[in-house]
UniProtKB/Swiss-Prot annotation:
Protein name stated in the entry: Core protein OPG142
Family, as annotated: Belongs to the orthopoxvirus OPG142 family.
Entry keyword Transcription regulation: yes
Record's subunit section: Part of a complex composed of the kinase OPG054, OPG092, OPG100, OPG114, OPG115, OPG142 and OPG157.
Keywords assigned: ATP-binding, DNA-binding, Helicase, Host cytoplasm, Hydrolase, Late protein, Nucleotide-binding, Phosphoprotein, Transcription, Transcription regulation, Transcription termination, Virion
Organism: Vaccinia virus (strain Copenhagen)
Length: 94
């Protein structure tokens, strides 16, 4: 996923699929990245928030905070999950 330079990244586990606006992969958290447990502030310079693997409580906290400070920006949610095949084989009985 491409992340804008004016975006804030809030994560529970760091994803492996983030790229900045120039196309380089963001390997490690930087100064615009926070965990859900850390404190952060939103201001007018931040145009969007990327939430990575949030819990339902984390989503609710961010939504309440956004509404309370009347921040007008976009929120994007990214869920990462392993693609594990089912323990059985699907068979088509034609």
């Amino acid at each position: 996923m491409f992340v804008d330079d004016n975006s804030l990244i809030i994560y529970s586990t760091w994803p492996s699929t983030l790229s900045d606006s120039s196309g380089r992969v963001i390997v490690m958290p930087d100064n615009r990245s926070f965990t859900f447990k850390e404190g952060f502030k939103l201001d007018e310079s931040i145009k969007s928030i990327l939430l990575v693997n949030p819990s339902s409580i984390d989503l609710l906290k961010i939504r309440v905070y956004k509404h309370r400070i009347k921040w007008m920006g976009d929120i994007f949610v990214l869920f990462e999950q392993e693609n594990i095949p089912p323990p059985f084989r699907l068979v088509n009985d034609k």
